[in-house]
Amino acid sequence: YSLIHDDLPCMDNDDLRRGKPTNHKRFGECTATLAGDALQAAAFETILTAPLPAEVNVAAGLTLARGAGALGMCGGQQLDMEGETRIFTLKEVARMNQLKTGCLLNAACVMGVLAAGVPMDDPMVAAAERYAKVIGLAFQVRDDMLNVTSTEEEMGKPVGNDIESHKSTYV
């Protein structure tokens, strides 16, 4: 859902994703917004109705809510938009990307550990969080670099748009 919202004209305004027209280009902005919202609701429904102990479902749902919310992906997306109006420090870029990308990866990793029956206070949860943070950073640095060094054909989406939009990136 987050990528559908990220492609909208009010966010990144991307026309292509993986070489295909973005949802809002194919179906319109209203449908794309609703599709993103519906996918988010479906994620919570899937978590809360999974055949797991109730306390695991609740912990997983809370993990996703925190990862997606104002102190997670949504907060990072807001910083991303603010990064178009001023130049961020490297520390601010790192914070933005940790929220924008890292928090949902963190939620996915932690929910996997929880679904395996590991309690929240187990060191495995902290290990999953560290893993997600490093993977999120690597993904974002690579994505930022490819945005200036790659081609639209290679990426399946426009490149160079971060510079055009004056976005704060690792590059």
Give a label for each model feature.
Residues Y1-V171:
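All-alpha prenyltransferase/terpene-synthase fold signal
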